[in-house]
Each structure stands twice: as structure tokens, then as C-alpha cells.
Amino acid sequence: MKIHEYQGKEILRSFGVPVPRGIPAFTVQEAVEAAQKLGGPVWVVKAQIHAGGRGKGGGVKVAKSIDDVKKLAGDILGMQLKTHQTGPEGQKVRRLYIEDGADIKNELYVSLVTDRATQKVALIASSEGGMDIEEVAHSTPDKIVTEMIDPLTGITPEQGRKVAEAIGLSGKSVDQALDIFAKLYKCYMDTDASLVEINPLNCDSKGDLMALDAKFNFDANALFRHPEIVALRDLDEEDPAEVEASKFDLAYISLDGNIGCLVNGAGLAMATMDTIKLFGGEPANFLDVGGGATPEKVTEAFKIMLKNPKVEGILVNIFGGIMKCDTIATGVITACKAVNLNVPLVVRMKGTNEELGKKMLAESGLPIIAADTMAEAATKIVAAVK
């Protein structure tokens, strides 16, 4: 789960990480009132969307008067902001953050992310923060510093000092960095985050550090422990199909192809998409119905897939372990009738009650194309949509 910058900064502030004063705004009038309350003389008007690259996309602007704030707020609110993370369609801006301007001297980068290979938390930092951090990571990876933190000990002063000095800090800035790193790590652990990123972490002309941006990703599996974080969720920033799927406990991710996929098990789902690609097709989604799918869940899965106008065919690939093939067959038949299916459907079933499931589909009177192997299933659905 992601949240907005202004929400992330409130979390950072609650853990003692220095951030500028700022006020969220949902209208131009609220933006003007926020600027008046902050007092100026310089403000930053920031688009709030769940994507990076806002500055390059024109979603972050500096204002030097209340009139500037009013004009910029009007320009940015409602715009379709396009960045390298939104895709070509962009993301509509529905919220702004009006913030005090900052004395920017040196933009640094710092983040925490779980490293599954080492089972530790990676503290990643760079002296080259700001809008071009992706290019820095690609072109000059030697400017990226990584320190692995053992969850049993947490971040040590020695580790913090090593990173701070590696990104060019000295004097009191090092001590401030140690404090920020420790608080950031506590924030990361206490909120069950999967990513906490500050870009940039500003070092001003006096050597003081402050987080000028905040990005959070949270582990969805741990959200039951954090109702206060769940309350920050902005459904307008999420794919409507994915939001709908989550209501039925379906793992769904939209893709750009034209072949809908319904599979049980994440590994099999990924293998199914790979096989479709191998035979010249393009998957329209990732959809894992899980091991406890009911006919009702299968029906909802079909409805969600078919809301995508790009879907020209559907491939159902089921391995019957805990999930019985006859249960899926019942769901497929019910779904086909409920949605009045009018695109080709290929079904491949293997495992528990396989023969019964196949018999039910064959006797359903529906134009369902059967397949015995993944290769056969992929070949048939690719041919059917061409």
C-alpha cells in the first residue's frame, strides 16, 4: 500500500525526523489559505499522486507570492500528470501540498528497503539525490552506498557514521544524519513498511538536514496491525479493478495485453503469463484466485477481467490441489452464464477431481475450449484472439 507525500511526512514528523511545515489542499482556495497560514515568503506547490518524477512532470512548482500560489494551484489541480512511473495516460491530480520553501544547498538520497536475499534491511544512500537519482543509479552506481542492517541489532552508530561520511557529510551534519537514520529505521520497523525513501534529504547552507520528500510503501500483509495507516489509503490513486478484486480477496494486477488469465497460485499464474508470451500472446492481467476459491469468487473474477475492454479472450489454468477442479468448473460455468461470455475461453485443469471438472465443462453446452497442457492452452487462446 502507498500513501501521499504529505501523509508520509506526518509519519516522519511523528518519529522525530525533521520535515518542512506544510498543509494539504484539495481546492485552489484551500491552497491559498494554506499559503497564507504558512506565511511565506516562498512556498512550494506540490501535486500529490502515488508516483515519482512529479518535478520533471511539472507537478512541483515554486511560488513567491500568494498570486503565484493561486495560479499554480489552479494549473496543477485536475491536471493529468505524466511521469515515468504513471505511464503515458498519466494520473489525475486531486490533492496538493503547500509547503514552506527550503534553503537547498546539497540534495542527498536515503532509503530503507528489505533485502530478502540477506534477510536484512538495506540502508541505501547517495550524495546525488534529487530528480535524477534513477540516472545516477544507472550511470554511476559507485555513488550509491548500501549498508545492511541486522534486525536483531538495528542500525549501529558505526554504520550510520560510515554511510553519512560516504555521502560527503561532515561536522554536525554527520551527527544529524546518525539521528535521522536511527529514527528512520525505527519508523520503518514500527510501521511494517517495505520501503521508506527520502529524496531529497536536504543539507542546507548551515549544515542542517531536512526531509524534503517522503515515499512510503507498506507491507499489505501487515496492515491488519495498522488501522491508522489503512485510514490513509486513497482509492482514487489505485486501479479500480484492483480495488474491486481486493474486496473478494483476489490477487489482481492489470497489465497491457488482451488475454485475461485466471489461475490458482502465484507461481502458476506467472508461469501461465510467461507461456502466453512465449506463444506470441500478451496477458491482460495477473489473477490468482487462491486455494480457497468458491464459485462466487470465480464469477467475480470473470466480471473484473471482462470490465477491461482490451480483453479478447480468457485462459483459465488450474492445478487442483487444495482447490478442486470441479469447484472451478462450477465457478466457470456460473460465471459464463452470469456475464454472458462473448469472448473465447480456454480451460486447462489438472489435479483433484480433474475428470469430473472436465466432464462438467464438456456437458455445460458452453463454447469452452479444453486443453491438457500449458503449451496447448496458450497456443489455443493465442490463436483464438488473432
Curated annotation (Swiss-Prot):
It catalyses: succinate + ATP + CoA = succinyl-CoA + ADP + phosphate; GTP + succinate + CoA = succinyl-CoA + GDP + phosphate. Substrate binds at N264, G321, I322, M323. InterPro entries: ATP-grasp, ATP-grasp_succ-CoA_synth-type, ATP_grasp_subdomain_1, Succ-CoA_synthase_bsu_CS, SUCC_ACL_C, Succ_CoA_ligase-like_bsu, Succinyl-CoA_synth-like. Mg(2+) binds at N199, D213. GO terms for molecular function: ATP binding; magnesium ion binding; succinate-CoA ligase (ADP-forming) activity; succinate-CoA ligase (GDP-forming) activity. Binds 1 Mg(2+) ion per subunit. The keyword Aminoacyl-tRNA synthetase does not apply. Coiled coil: none annotated. Its cofactor is Mg(2+). One of its GO terms (cellular component) is succinate-CoA ligase complex. Residues 9-244 form the ATP-grasp domain. ATP binds at K46, G53, R54, G55, E99, A102, E107. Pathway: Carbohydrate metabolism; tricarboxylic acid cycle; succinate from succinyl-CoA (ligase route): step 1/1. Keywords: ATP-binding, Ligase, Magnesium, Metal-binding, Nucleotide-binding, Tricarboxylic acid cycle. Its EC number is 6.2.1.5. Disulfide bonds: none annotated. GO terms for biological process: succinyl-CoA metabolic process; tricarboxylic acid cycle. Belongs to the succinate/malate CoA ligase beta subunit family. Heterotetramer of two alpha and two beta subunits. Succinyl-CoA synthetase functions in the citric acid cycle (TCA), coupling the hydrolysis of succinyl-CoA to the synthesis of either ATP or GTP and thus represents the only step of substrate-level phosphorylation in the TCA. The beta subunit provides nucleotide specificity of the enzyme and binds the substrate succinate, while the binding sites for coenzyme A and phosphate are found in the alpha subunit. This is Succinate--CoA ligase [ADP-forming] subunit beta. It comes from Paracidovorax citrulli (strain AAC00-1).
